[in-house]
Amino acid sequence: MKWLSRILTVIVAMSMACGALIFNRRHQLKAKTLNFNHKSLTIIIPARNEEKRIGHLLHSIIQQQVPVDVIVMNDGSTDETARVARSYGATVVDVVDDADGKWYGKSHACYQGVTHACTNRIAFVDADVTFLRKDAVETLINQYQLQGEKGLLSVQPYHITKRFYEGFSAIFNLMTVVGMNVFSTLDDGRTNQHAFGPVTLTNKEDYYATGGHKSANRHIIEGFALGSAYTSQSLPVTVYEGFPFVAFCMYQEGFQSLQEGWTKHLSTGAGGTKPKIMAAIVLWLFGSIASILGLCLSLKYRQMSVGKMLTVYLSYTTQFIYLHRRVGQFSNLLMVCHPLLFMFFTKIFIQSWKQTHRYGVVEWKGRQYSISKEQ
């Protein structure tokens, strides 16, 4: 069995080499004080039954050092979303249904929101997002100024978990970031065509020139469509990590919501990752199974060194934790038990593939979305 021990060790070593390459290029926001004394930004928040989350976002906006306009696009909420938003001084606008009823959801709400914005600079922020620092909005504006106030800037918030089950989002969050290609030196350096969805910043002129969210009217993951629309007009598209400025809490409704949410996300997300980066990601993930397999076999067969296989497992685990700490705050127990996370990720991936290729639809927040047109 020593030969098997050597093979598994080599596989894990190759896996970790891939892990070192998939996220070795950082894109971090840099703090900057701008001292605006006028409202230089309109924040548009699409909201559908967000009464339990939107208050945290609005409170963090109030704490910002620069004044902003806030528009909450109430997309058919049946709870107290509108009342909560008004209590924080936000302007609440009810989303008007599309004439033919075929365009609905986040992209529809965002597009309507722009018509109510009084500033040229606009940001779209999901209701489950929170600004962690008082200079967060200033930092976003400064970063946008550094790209000449042109194009699209997007941020993937740092994931803060409050319940144990929320940690099962760990691999999905990491894949969301590294799947953008630009965070790896394996990327060929060509123009980025994708954007994160939770936080985006742009200007009205470029927004309307590209079609804005209208370009995403048939898409579930609107960031990809937005990024492609801006790139087609030769406008810059940039992506950044959220920590330590922007965070979110995901799928707090329960484990079922988490499964449905990531099934929806994976249904269209994987196709944007370049083949060589996807190959590196797959090999890195396979290291989780190879490392636990070696450890389990060493406990059964004396020919395999338990100490060696434990070292291999802990080495992979250390890298696994290190990479995930960049994108979120997750349970240490789940991080150590990463094979469980890998198996859950695989389950959702297969489920998403079936819904994409067999059924052509996914359900989210009581609505069905066709995904056949996004492939």
Curated annotation (Swiss-Prot):
A single Gene Ontology CC term: plasma membrane
Enzyme class: transferase
Membrane-spanning ranges: 3-23, 164-184, 277-297, 330-350
Keywords recorded for this protein, A-Z: Carotenoid biosynthesis, Cell membrane, Glycosyltransferase, Membrane, Transferase, Transmembrane, Transmembrane helix
Gene Ontology annotations of biological process type: carotenoid biosynthetic process
Superkingdom, natural source: Bacteria
Localization of this protein: Cell membrane
EC number: 2.4.1.-
Associated pathway: Carotenoid biosynthesis; staphyloxanthin biosynthesis; staphyloxanthin from farnesyl diphosphate: step 4/5
Molecular function via GO: glycosyltransferase activity
Cited InterPro entries: Glyco_trans_2-like, Nucleotide-diphossugar_trans
Bilayer topology annotation: Multi-pass membrane protein
Disulfide bond sites: none
Family named by the database record: Belongs to the glycosyltransferase 2 family. CrtQ subfamily.
Stated name of the protein: 4,4'-diaponeurosporenoate glycosyltransferase
Gene: crtQ
